[in-house]
């Protein structure tokens, strides 16, 4: 049996992690598209 606390932590961390990755990727894409000579 999976502990309810562990299950809650996983269910809470997964969306936050995906959201963080999406936001960082979006910021990098927007930054590179707005400033082509960023590198």
Curated annotation (Swiss-Prot):
The keyword Plastid does not apply. It is a single-pass membrane protein. Keywords: Electron transport, Membrane, Photosynthesis, Thylakoid, Transmembrane, Transmembrane helix, Transport. SUPFAM superfamilies: PetG subunit of the cytochrome b6f complex. One of its GO terms (biological process) is photosynthesis. GO terms for molecular function: electron transporter, transferring electrons within cytochrome b6/f complex of photosystem II activity. Belongs to the PetG family. Component of the cytochrome b6-f complex, which mediates electron transfer between photosystem II (PSII) and photosystem I (PSI), cyclic electron flow around PSI, and state transitions. PetG is required for either the stability or assembly of the cytochrome b6-f complex. This is Cytochrome b6-f complex subunit 5.
């Amino acid at each position: 049996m999976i502990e309810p606390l562990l299950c809650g932590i996983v269910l809470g961390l997964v969306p936050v992690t995906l959201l963080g990755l999406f936001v960082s990727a979006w910021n990098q894409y927007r930054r590179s598209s707005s400033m082509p000579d960023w590198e």
